[in-house]
A protein has these predicted regions:
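Short, small/acidic-rich helices and loops at N termini and domain boundaries
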Residues: 1-57
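Glycine-biased, small-residue-rich flexible motifs in mid-sequence functional cores and linkers
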Residues: 38, 43-46, 50-172
Length: 172
């Protein structure tokens, strides 16, 4: 699909054949297409962008290197494929030392074409994103619970700061 080797009709035929071969499993392509169209309308209304894996300019290219990449992402803001992605992970219950080290680490890296990636969760994720925003570095977040479930809630402002600074947040 991503390499456009098959047209839409071919794709529908292949998918229908694969699914219908499963014993006792019926698939209604029209129902699925209607559901997808409704989701697209909701995304447009809510200001949610849809990123498709075959959109090489906008989809996170690093995700195409994993064994089971998502076919589609939903997000707010933009993804930066021009900078090297660097994931920052750590404890939600960080120590003062961990907080200091994370800030120092991200501040130092902000001098380079690095894209700080984290989960916008409490603790180290928050420190990494906030430090990146404060330093003018690129940062993006991947949310585990969906776009409408920023947790902790107080990070909603940080999510907007990420967008305002040229980044974004995304989910499957």
């Amino acid at each position: 699909i991503a390499t456009n080797q098959h047209g839409e009709k071919d794709l529908k035929s292949i998918v229908y054949q694969l699914i219908s071969e499963k014993e006792g499993f019926g698939f209604n392509w029209d129902k699925a297409a209607n559901r997808a169209a409704k989701e697209q309308v909701i995304c447009q209304r809510e200001g949610v962008a849809i990123f498709y894996a075959n959109d090489v300019d906008n989809f996170p290219s690093i995700l195409l290197e994993i064994s089971d990449p998502p076919v589609v992402l939903f997000g707010r803001g933009v993804w930066n494929n021009k900078k090297v992605p660097l994931s920052v992970i750590g404890s939600r219950k960080m120590t003062n030392y961990g907080k200091h080290q994370c800030r120092h680490f991200v501040e130092d890296l902000s001098q380079f074409p690095i894209n700080i990636i984290s989960g916008l969760a409490m603790g180290i994720d928050t420190v990494a994103h906030q430090t990146a925003v404060d330093c003018g570095a690129s940062t993006q977040a991947f949310l585990a619970g969906g776009l409408g479930h920023i947790s902790p809630k107080r990070n909603t402002l940080l999510a907007q700061q990420i967008i305002d600074s040229g980044g974004g947040y995304f989910t499957e």
